[in-house]
Amino acid sequence: MKNENNNPRKSNIIGICVSQLQNHEVSGLTHTIYQCARANGYQVMVFGCFAKMDFPTPHSNGEASIFENIPMKDLKALILMGQTILHRELLLRLRDEAVAVGTPVITVDYELEKCFNIRLDYLSCFKRLVRHVIEGHHRHNPYFMAGFKGNAFSEERLDAFVEVLEENGMPVVQEHIAYGDFWGKPARRVCEQWMERTDDFPDAIICANDTMALAVIDVLEENGYHVPEDVIVTGFDGIELIKYCIPRLTTGRVDQEEIAEQIMHIVKRVETDPETAPQSVLVPFHILRGESCGCAPIHF
């Protein structure tokens, strides 16, 4: 990417724009990128805040002021943690300010034109996870707990569930699919309704994220069912909380170190050849086989 000022950039600083730093996964990834950058000889400036930016409020607007005076021309590269900010106009402004002074922009899990985009391959892993339950554990009556209706992540995972059912010649029963809105309380309500189906009980409940899966396990156990002996439960995302739950949840998780390494690879490539055209890099998710599917023995 060409430096519009035609001056060699002496700075060795990488900037990171991020929000929702109170989230353990967000702060963990930010720290992993920081450590990887330092190990590769770069300094790091983190422009971070805690508010959600997708629905602007006076409070979030105040926190967003951290992004107003970033020294773009002094940065080796700018990293936008787009899924933590979720304010498209703000992300576009930051991108344009960086590009205008020749600073390459790298996005994480949020695609923008004129940027190097680190994309996360949720779909392939989620399909493998569904196949693991149906084909690996031979479950014949799986239910699916989606997130928000219409949400891209939720609908993509629902489509994956349906696709794997059809691959295995299994019927898609709409009554076996419900929306838990990615949160614990809505997921509990849905699962409590499922508990009333004595004549059509699931032998597996596949959830679109870990938070809902943990709520489902709680409801099952409160109603006298054992996980995974009676019902297999799986989640997705690999949140920190699953480390402290019994049974340990089977889920999918991205390798944060791989994200950081891909970012460093891009930074070094652009450093060597400033005319490198922006492109996308796909980082895979991996299945973490835990206790909730029966792959690992339960330890108390």
Model-flagged regions — what are they?
Residues 35-36, 75-76, 188, 297-300:
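PLP-dependent class I/II
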Residues 190-300:
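Flexible loop/turn connectors
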Residues 18-28, 47-61, 84-86, 118-128, ...:
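Hinge/beta->alpha junction and helix N-cap segments in small-molecule ligand-binding domains
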Residues 39-42, 165-172, 197-200, 222-227:
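Short helix-capping segments at alpha-helix termini
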Residues 140-141, 172-176, 227-232:
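Short acidic capping loops at alpha-helix termini that bridge into adjacent secondary structure
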Residues 10-11, 138-139, 202, 284:
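Phosphate-coordination loops involved in phosphoryl transfer and adenosine-cofactor binding
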Residues 1-131, 196, 200:
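Alpha-helical recognition/docking segments in bacterial nutrient-uptake
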